[in-house]
Design a protein with these regions (language model features):
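Hydrophobic/aromatic ligand-binding patch that stacks against planar heteroaromatic rings
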Residues: 25, 119, 282, 325
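N-terminal beta-loop-helix "entrance" segment that forms/cooperates
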Residues: 33-57, 276-277, 301-307
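Short phosphate-binding loop-to-helix
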Residues: 51-54, 74, 319
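Conserved mixed alpha/beta catalytic, RNA-binding, or beta-rich assembly cores of soluble enzyme
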Residues: 14, 18-24, 30-31, 39, ...
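Short, conserved micro-motifs enriched in small and acidic residues
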Residues: 68-69, 317
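C-terminal non-catalytic interaction/assembly regions of soluble proteins
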Residues: 252, 262-323, 329-333, 339-343
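C-terminal edge-of-domain segments
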Residues: 204-219, 223-226, 324-351
């Protein structure tokens, strides 16, 4: 899943007019600008082996690519590189007179539609966006998911089904747990029908539920959970603890707090465990970052948790999982620490 960040945008220009427009844009937002050797100026990187070669080289390295020139040229160059709308970068094309800004690739998931609107506003140009939900002035489920940094089971199929329902005029409800009311109010919800009480649903064809809950009560309509990634897990373990055991215990701890595994945002441990195979494999399996903290950083918070002299002698701090979860969640812990088979797991929920 790709999210456009202003500091990770590459821009390609092929003509003198394109260079002038690139300099205009570079004065307003951070860009890495590429052009031919013949047109190179200060602040521009020359193509390495030509335009197509340079584009291929950076395609997976930036969150977004801007091409100043003909759409057809961009299509021909990028066609062999396109892989998946959930991971490909946003691609936007601008004509060198800055009359039109075109969202070409990864409109929702990559953020190309949002970038197109932003650039068009800066340039007083016409944004050209062709995704069905946008042209019908509706929100899209994949956009909502990325705005909330949320996951779903079978995300691709859910997005296809729900977006088609929205475009077809079906009644798709949108409900959230109270803790997400503020975040949801800042999201694009056009076309969704607000739902405040799961026990008193209006007439609906489908329902989206924004929640961290592991399970929901029985509902009379087709529904999908949209699960924001908010849960963090501090983990302490003995050397060479198998990933399978860590995974089983983590799932048990999440279940004890009635939290959906999709809500996991990060796992962490002490720096001494930075290369612990089981922990690294667990992070990879859960598709989350593995973050580590120095013993010194953890000692600042170990007074909040029961300490072990053995752990202190081994890693330099009397408690690992609690202080790690405290740091990852800014002190917003959830439930009791699991202690089993040489493993400790403490959960927290980020804001």
């Amino acid at each position: 899943m790709n999210t456009v960040k202003p500091e990770s945008i590459a821009l390609f220009c092929l003509t003198p007019g394109g260079v002038r427009l690139a300099k205009r844009l570079a004065a307003m937002l951070p860009l890495t600008c590429y052009t031919s050797e013949a047109l190179q100026e200060e602040g521009f990187i020359p193509f390495n082996g030509g335009f197509a070669s340079a584009a291929r080289e950076v395609f997976s390295s930036f969150s977004a690519l801007i091409f100043i020139g003909a759409t057809g040229i961009a299509v021909r160059v990028l066609a062999p590189l396109v892989n998946d709308k959930l991971s490909d970068p946003a691609v936007v094309v601008i004509d060198e007179r800055a009359r039109h800004v075109i969202s070409l690739l990864s409109g929702h998931a990559g953020g190309a539609n949002a970038l197109t609107r932003y650039l068009a506003g800066m340039l007083d140009a016409d944004p050209v966006i062709t995704t069905a939900t946008d042209v019908n002035e509706l929100a899209a489920l994949d956009t909502l998911a990325f705005q909330l940094n949320a996951r779903m089971t079978d995300f691709r199929a859910a997005v296809k089904t729900v977006n088609q329902m929205l475009v077809s005029g079906k009644r798709v409800g949108l409900w959230c747990d109270g803790e997400f009311t503020g975040a949801l109010s800042r999201c694009d919800r056009r076309g969704f029908i607000p739902v405040s009480d799961l026990a008193r649903l209006p007439a609906l064809d489908a329902l989206i539920c924004v929640t961290l809950r592991r399970s929901l009560p029985p509902l009379p309509v087709p529904h999908w959970k949209l699960v924001p990634q908010r849960v963090v897990a501090g983990i302490g373990c003995r050397r060479d603890t198998p990933c399978a055991l860590l995974s089983t215990l983590l799932d048990r701890q999440l279940a004890a707090q009635r939290l959906d595994p999709l809500a996991l945002k990060a796992i962490g441990s002490v720096s001494l465990k930075a290369n612990e195979p089981g922990l690294r494999q667990l992070a990879h399996r859960c598709r989350v970052p593995f973050e580590t903290f120095s013993a010194e950083a953890l000692r600042e918070h170990e007074h909040r948790f029961p300490a072990s002299s053995f752990v202190r002698e081994t890693v330099g701090v009397g408690s690992v999982s609690g202080p790690v979860a405290w740091l990852l969640s800014q002190g917003n812990l959830s439930g009791e620490t699991l202690r089993e088979q040489g493993v400790t797991i403490t959960l927290g929920v980020t804001h």
